[in-house]
Amino acid sequence: LDAVTSPPSTPLCLKLARSYDRIGNHAEACRWALSLVDAGDDYAAWQAGWTLFQRNAQRTVWPAARTVKVAIAGSYTTTQLGAMVRLAAARIGIRIDLYESPYGQYQQDIIDPASNLYAFAPDIVLLAVHEGDLHLAEFSPDPAEEVQREVSRWTALWNLATTLSRARIVQHNFAVPCDIPTGHLATRLPGSRYMMTQAVNTGLGAAAGTAVSIVDCERLSALIGKQRWYDPRYWNLSKQAVALDALPLLARHTAAVIAADLGLSRKCLVLDLD
């Protein structure tokens, strides 16, 4: 029964990928490793799938619609995110050559014209940042000015990166944390960090236009659950701002946005014949 489910289950995909890997059928091992992207959001399975895909793709001709150079300019540990994005992108026919900024050096990499980021000559710069990077007070007497200043800070980074390279920008916006000092009162206080963070997200969306693509991490964190999105254990142990369990979801949506930027999104015409 598992063999005819659509999509196949995560354990089945992983079992088949490993079986084909053992017998040396590299193309089928790749196919089933990539099927894990559609099967669910199990981080351990995705990690195993990426290892299997990497090993077998080197030994067979694996077609890719596009090859793209992506630079992750991150404010937290992005090693795991990079692997997950590459797996999700491979599933939709994109081969990613990856550069990762050193931990927390995203601003320095973007500001310095001689940085390794620009030497890499990326097609896409992915700003993988989190709510803790916002220069916002817990409460502001002038929230409009503070929000505008913060929006301008991020758009200045966009403009600098596009001026010093030909790359498009993909920006992760900011997931509002579930622990808020002012609690339910925050929604009544325009100057609370909670409300200003949402205003920054709205401002970035308005400023992006057609030049910058936004991955809506605030929506994704609500989809998976705020307590699953951020786990303080991972932050304290390895400065991982997005919990490992949430990385597959974030990677899938990031890869989809990259595909759309490359013109690889799919159109579907649905006709109701009733």
Give the residues covered by each predicted segment.
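Alpha-helical cap/lid subdomain in secreted, periplasmic
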Residues: 2-10, 15-28, 35, 59-68, ...
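Short N-terminal or domain-adjacent regulatory/targeting segments
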Residues: 30-64
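Alpha-helical substrate-recognition element adjacent to the catalytic core
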Residues: 269-270, 274
